[in-house]
Amino acid sequence: MKVLGIETSCDDCCVAVVENGIHILSNIKLNQTEHKKYYGIVPEIASRLHTEAIMSVCIKALKKANTKISEIDLIAVTSRPGLIGSLIVGLNFAKGLAISLKKPIICIDHILGHLYAPLMHSKIEYPFISLLLSGGHTLIAKQKNFDDVEILGRTLDDACGEAFDKVAKHYDMGFPGGPNIEQISKNGDENTFQFPVTTFKKKENWYDFSYSGLKTACIHQLEKFKSKDNPTTKNNIAASFQKAAFENLITPLKRAIKDTQINKLVIAGGVASNLYLREKIDKLKIQTYYPPLDLCTDNGAMIAGLGFNMYLKYGESPIEIDANSRIENYKNQYRGKNNEKNFSNA
């Protein structure tokens, strides 16, 4: 079965063709560089650029896959969560194709797509712990299957990638912040500043993260946390921030691994490409899987791959389904016992 995967939840316009849930025939992505001058994503610009680009990106994906549009068996599209304007562009485009081609459509949750992405590169046996790190999401999950996911912990404020973007914007390090801070920090001393690392002691927040304190310390209270006589340079700020940002993840992650007794870890999301983070994770001495870069960031292949499996289990989504920018109380929404209700129609 050939599946056309469409992903437009944020600023990347992505279309892919995947066969039988795992064989990637094409995976085309158009980055919107217009946002760089604003040091962040402007929703109105993102949705307009998706409208302008999605047809040509789709044509490129089909051409790369050597596949005619009539040979597509299923259309998978991200319907939640994300920027509502961007989601609507992708969803309406997918609906138009489904109606005109008389093909089934399956709506996919963006978070579940990221959690599925590593499975397209490596054969990984369930269960495992997943760590999703991106500009919009930071969470730890326990996975027993592609649709049996329990969110153990998540950020209570900024996502990890979002904190990188905000610090980079303040110090004029460029956008997106993640790769720029990683590069700038290579020539810095990570011990120049001892920024605070947040860990929670309450049971209900045992696996959760927080980045607001770290972000505030780095942007507004810099000299308060200076611990060495090194100069206050961008390199030293970047290195010290990056160190604290990833130390922020380690304690909740260790807790999840210990409490679940699952010694298998899968890293997903754009931040997963950071090599400094990978060095930190590797020190945990557990079996760890990293997807390739093109599957770390937003992409259509993960939507098509998961869409294939969701369709076989749950069938198609109703054509009248709407996009949803947010998921209320999502720590409970993703528990395995609610899977059919929450995942079958995304």
Curated annotation (Swiss-Prot):
Pfam families: TsaD. It comes from the Bacteria. One of its GO terms (molecular function) is iron ion binding. Its EC number is 2.3.1.234. GO terms for cellular component: cytoplasm. Fe cation binds at residues 110, 114, 298. The keyword Transferase applies. It is found in: Cytoplasm. It catalyses: L-threonylcarbamoyladenylate + adenosine(37) in tRNA = N(6)-L-threonylcarbamoyladenosine(37) in tRNA + AMP + H(+). Its cofactor is Fe(2+). Binds 1 Fe(2+) ion per subunit. Keywords: Acyltransferase, Cytoplasm, Iron, Metal-binding, Transferase, tRNA processing. Substrate binds at residues 132-136, 165, 178, 274. InterPro entries: ATPase_NBD, Gcp-like_dom, KAE1/TsaD, Peptidase_M22_CS, TsaD. One of its GO terms (biological process) is tRNA threonylcarbamoyladenosine modification. NCBIfam families: gcp_kae1 (TIGR00329), T6A_TsaD_YgjD (TIGR03723). Belongs to the KAE1 / TsaD family. Required for the formation of a threonylcarbamoyl group on adenosine at position 37 (t(6)A37) in tRNAs that read codons beginning with adenine. Is involved in the transfer of the threonylcarbamoyl moiety of threonylcarbamoyl-AMP (TC-AMP) to the N6 group of A37, together with TsaE and TsaB. TsaD likely plays a direct catalytic role in this reaction. This is tRNA N6-adenosine threonylcarbamoyltransferase. It comes from Borreliella burgdorferi (strain ATCC 35210 / DSM 4680 / CIP 102532 / B31) (Borrelia burgdorferi).
